[in-house]
Each structure stands twice: as C-alpha cells, then as structure tokens.
C-alpha cells in the first residue's frame, strides 16, 4: 500500500461557546471553552490515519505549552510525525467563538506554521499521495 504524506499546519484551536457572538467593543460571558487539536494539515493526517491510511506528517510547532498538547495528540495516533519541526516561537492556534445556533467567528495565528523549512522535508518512500493546503507558506507547497 502507498503512503499518504501531509505537509501542513498544526493549530491548537481554542473554542469558546457563547450565547452569541459579541459585537464590536463588547465583552460577554462565555459558557464553556475547549482546547482542540487542529490545523488543516493535522486534521487531514488524523482523518487519514483513522481511515486506515499509512500517514506521514511534516509541519512545525513552537516551543510552548501548545506544542506539547499538539504532539501528545499525535502520539495517541499512528501518524508518523518524525518530520515535525520545532521552532522557538509560538505554535499555531485559533480562537473561535461559537454561538448557540452554530454560527461562529474566528481568528487564526499561524505562528511557527509560517516557518516550515521546506528544504529539510524529505518525501517518505512509497508515497502515493501528497496533501497540501493554504495554511502554510506558498513556497512550501511549491
């Protein structure tokens, strides 16, 4: 069987459940908060792994507590993330405010995702599919 190779972003998603999305300059009290593994690259890799694909992931995290949570999540899968790079800055993250209807607003901070060193990425042997997405620098995708 051919391998699936994902080169992409890893984010820790901070999801705040709220009665509604605040208006400009307004603060409201949220109902709950969740910290969820995310990033398009990370989500693609985990989904492929959960569906039985032999999956490799190349990406970049920072040297912060979010990086520890992200790598711990990957350790609980069979995704090979030995190509994961570690930078000195902040890991990627997003903050989403989700209202009861499901509508949401979000902001993404790419952090170390923007500093993936494409020259140090080696495509694993027997790779049949390469997945890329737009949460990383275009030069990495090229």
Spans of features found by a protein language model:
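Glycine-rich phosphate/adenosyl-contacting loop at the front of the ribokinase-like
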Residues: 1-58, 65-68, 138
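Ribokinase/PfkB-type carbohydrate-kinase core domain
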Residues: 1-10, 56, 68-86, 98-142
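Residue-level signature of transmembrane alpha-helix interfaces in integral membrane proteins
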Residues: 24-25, 29, 94, 110, ...
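Hydrophobic/aromatic pocket-lining and membrane-interface residues
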Residues: 48, 74, 95
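Extreme N-terminal leader/targeting regions
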Residues: 61-62, 74
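Conserved beta-strand edge residues that scaffold enzyme active sites
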Residues: 62-63, 88-89
């Amino acid at each position: 069987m051919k391998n699936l190779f994902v080169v992409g972003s890893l984010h820790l998603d901070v999801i705040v459940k709220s009665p509604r999305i605040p208006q400009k300059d307004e603060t409201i009290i949220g109902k709950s908060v969740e910290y969820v593994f995310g990033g398009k690259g990370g989500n693609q890799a985990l989904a492929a792994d959960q569906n039985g694909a032999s999956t490799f992931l190349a990406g970049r995290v920072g040297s912060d507590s979010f990086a520890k949570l992200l790598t711990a999540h990957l350790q609980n899968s069979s995704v090979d993330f030995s190509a994961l790079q570690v930078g000195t800055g902040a890991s990627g993250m997003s903050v989403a405010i989700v209202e009861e209807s499901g509508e949401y607003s979000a902001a993404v901070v790419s952090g170390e995702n923007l500093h993936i060193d494409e020259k140090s990425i080696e495509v694993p042997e027997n790779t049949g599919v390469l997945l890329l997405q737009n949460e990383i620098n275009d030069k990495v995708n090229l």
